[in-house]
Structure formats: C-alpha cells, structure tokens
Curated annotation (Swiss-Prot):
Keywords: Isomerase, tRNA processing. This is tRNA pseudouridine synthase A. GO terms for molecular function: RNA binding; tRNA pseudouridine(38-40) synthase activity. Formation of pseudouridine at positions 38, 39 and 40 in the anticodon stem and loop of transfer RNAs. The lineage of its organism: Bacteria, Pseudomonadati, Bacteroidota, Bacteroidia, Bacteroidales. It holds the Pfam family PseudoU_synth_1. It catalyses: uridine(38/39/40) in tRNA = pseudouridine(38/39/40) in tRNA. Its EC number is 5.4.99.12. Substrate binds at residue 112. The active site is at 52 (nucleophile).
Amino acid sequence: MARFFIYLAYNGTRYSGWQTQPNAPSVQQTVEEAISTIVRQPVGVVGAGRTDAGVHAHEMVAHADLPCDTPAEAATLTERLNKLLPRDIVIYRMAPVKADAHARFDAISRTYHYYLTEQKDPFMEGLMLKTYRKLDFERMNEAAALLPRYIDFTSFSKLHTDVKTNNCRITEARWMPLAQTGQWVFSITADRFLRNMVRAIVGTLFHVGTGKLSITDFRDIIESQDRSRAGSSAPAHALYLERVVYPSDLFL
C-alpha cells in the first residue's frame, strides 16, 4: 500500500457536503465506495476540508492508502474510477506522497471562490448567485482589504463548533470581474477556514455593497468577535473550493 493525494472536482448540488453523514449522500462516501469496489477492500479517504451541503469544488484534495505501486497503476485506477463515479464527480489525477502526508493537516493554503452574476443566466442556475441588488464592488473590495489585517474571525464562524481556535491567516480577499459582463468572483485565500466562514464574509460584504454597512461597520464587526453582528450567510450553491496548496517536499 502507498499513500496518494487524490485531486478531484465535484458539483455539490446533490450532496450533503464532503464529509460522510448518516442517511445522506456525501462526496467522501461516494468516492470511498467507488475505490473500495474497484480494489476489493475497504479504503478510507481524508479530504483537505469539509465543504458544506451544496458547495462545489474545482479542486479538492484527499489522501488515501492504495494498492498501487507505480504512477501507471494509479493512472489506471483513476480511469476506472471515473467510469464508475457519478457524472458530478471527477478525479483528475493521483500523486504519490510520503507515507505520513495528510491532506488536511499538511495544507499550507486554501482558496475559495464565490461566483456572482448581475444578469439572469439559465445556464448558470445553481452554479452562480443571481443578485437583484445594485452592489458597489469598489466599496466591497475596500472592506475585504481589511480582512488580512486580522486573525480572529469569530464574527464569521458558525456557532457551537468543536474547533480549538478561530484564528486564520488570510492572505488575499477581493472581488474581480469575469470576462462575461456582469459576472464577478470573490477570491479568498487563507491557511485555514472556519465552518461557514466564507459564506458569512460574503453575506456581510453584500451589506457593504448595498450601503447598509459602512467600511467602519465592517471593521467593527470583525473586532467585535460576535457572529450575531455579521450578515447572514450567502447561499451555498455559488461557493467553490478552488485550490489547495502543499509543501513540495511531500511529493515523491
């Protein structure tokens, strides 16, 4: 058995999230069952994070111990898995890593994207958020620029979770226009994220964009460490795990 990082993508619409849940379909369980079926033995996979119900991933990374001795065998397994997995999950590749490499704990950064459209587009339904409000993206970026100055993001954390700390180091947070007129993406990168954190930040930035909150209000919300003062969470269907980065010395 050798350890591999599995690079995959999924449309999260049909799933209760990444993590296995009782009596609800999850991406983790679907992938584990597919691998176990092909290799004819139980195989567990551990993801880089736990995306919520309805959240998508352009790049999720998971580790698993697999009966593959060579990259060619891993490539063959990848091909067989993609034939077995449902259409809303794809495995791009498998990379051999050190025996103790951990997809979650060894990640040095994660990037999420939140997609927004100002124009109704039936082909983006369930993949982007259609906004019916006029948003000031310059003001929203002014507020987002405050985020890397702080570490404690209790104000944007789901309440009553089992995490030991609400500290995160954000290195980038900004809205960018896409090539398609009227479409925007919010990109945020950090060493780690709290449960529901990105959606809470986006929902609060919407209030800045409509003028309901000032830049000072946004700063005060961060400093208050009070979730009740922040905005409601933005819908899950427009959020994507975009990229996970690891130290190069993990790979063989």
